Amino acid sequence: MGAKLSSAAVLAGFSGSIYGRLVMRIAAPELTPEQTYKLMSGIVVPRPIAWITTLGPGGKVNLAPFSCYTFVSNTPPMLGVNIGRKAGLRKDTARNMLEHGHFVVNVGNADLLDAIHASAEEHPPEVSEAELLQLDVLPGEAIATPRLAAAPVSLECVLHSVTPFGDTGAEFFVGEVRLFHIRDGLARDGKIDTTLLDPVCRIGGPNYARLGPLITKRTLRQTPKSVMGQDTP
């Protein structure tokens, strides 16, 4: 796990056994930011990847992958992505999102994995990772930010809110989706065929994964989604 955990962090080594297995107890407050990140990123898995395009200096298309990402609302559709800092400074993506107020979340598939990984390398703000990796872009339609032509799914978003978290300057960016771009054949009966999408996900370290065998269970009865104040009593 890189730097060793201090004896203060590991409480009395192994604390005993549960169902015949040893359990390690680690005191979270004693961990360094790097140690915490390595633990959390290996525990919270698998994580989908938001491959985000933003507008950088001079209109250059900045491109970077982020795996602390989810959707937070369905009406209106909203996505959330956590973006940390490097040496206390905002990353290019966060800075561009705050400056322009819009961005595109592209969803890459297994064919694009090498490019997804390479786009995580750090470059000066004026460098376009899309150009560097020879990835074609298409003009945005609802916003000014371009999207990746090769991405099977792209979501044009306007920035909704930014919430700071923790002591290292991490911020949770929420964007409202204004336009969905979905490659023909991926959507069936209003749903995405995940197998055809073939998304990649992030796990701990420089490691990724693809979908394994799908396990289908019986459909459970659920109350339909509704809009607060309109469809609810």
What are the functions of these language-model segments?
Residues 5:
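Cationic, low-complexity basic patches in intrinsically disordered or flexible, solvent-exposed regions
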Residues 9:
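Flexible, acidic active-site loops/lids enriched in D/E/S/T/G that coordinate Mg2+ and/or position polar
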Residues 12, 18-233:
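Basic, polyanion-binding surface patches
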